[in-house]
């Protein structure tokens, strides 16, 4: 009876996986068929235009790269520092438990709430305006819970014998964390960062809330420039009544997918290299 139940569970799980992969494959193939004809160097290097055949994604692609790099620069050090405190220093304090509870809740907060927070704090209170910095700071808030939770999980995977051996050699707690624990946890930290950035780069609602532009004829050249990103540009083209702009939107989706896959590929390479160095 148990073997039959296990077999049924395996079959149901396999069918669920196949259905999900087929649905995803159909969507990707459909988008590729619609947008592949528009993909070209000209499409990648042209800026926005009211004529579909002349429009490109350079401004949105550069905006996405600016925003995601700044988001990583903000979320990584803050998230790792918070995780180190919660996991290594504040494990028994009430403050740490309160922070843990709120971080777990923040991971499930709708992204539009982060947009409203960014509008109130970064755009108005700190007077950053509708800039790349305001967008990156807002997305960093969105990414922080994921970075913190994944970093804590990575720190927990480091054997306690590593810490004890370091202490036995006379190292301080911080020296142990910096020289032993963090290098071993780095692959997991990078995985969590890429997951957080992959979510952030596809967000539209928070950036529209803080005032990111749906039409902009130039690429940002500093952190204080106005900007748009690929998801907003895709939304703009999909909203147009002309069929040619739908083709542009499909091509832009392919560019966004390529950007996401590139980020994940870089993370995998770095993670594997760190794991090999850790084994050595």
Give residue ranges: language-model regions:
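Transmembrane alpha-helical segments of polytopic membrane transport and secretion proteins
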Residues: 1-17, 267-280
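Cytoplasmic-entry segments and transmembrane alpha-helices of multi-pass inner-membrane transporters
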Residues: 6-9, 78-118, 149-153, 277-280
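Interhelical loop and adjacent transmembrane-helix boundary motif
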Residues: 48-55, 207-257
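Transmembrane alpha-helix signature in integral membrane proteins
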Residues: 55-85, 193
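Transmembrane alpha-helices
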Residues: 72, 150-151, 173-211
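Amphipathic cytosolic juxtamembrane alpha-helices at the membrane-cytosol interface
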Residues: 78, 91-95, 100, 163-191
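Generic hydrophobic transmembrane alpha-helix motif, especially the helices
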Residues: 104-141
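C-terminal transmembrane helix and the adjacent membrane-cytosol boundary/short C-terminal tail
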Residues: 152, 156, 160, 167, ...
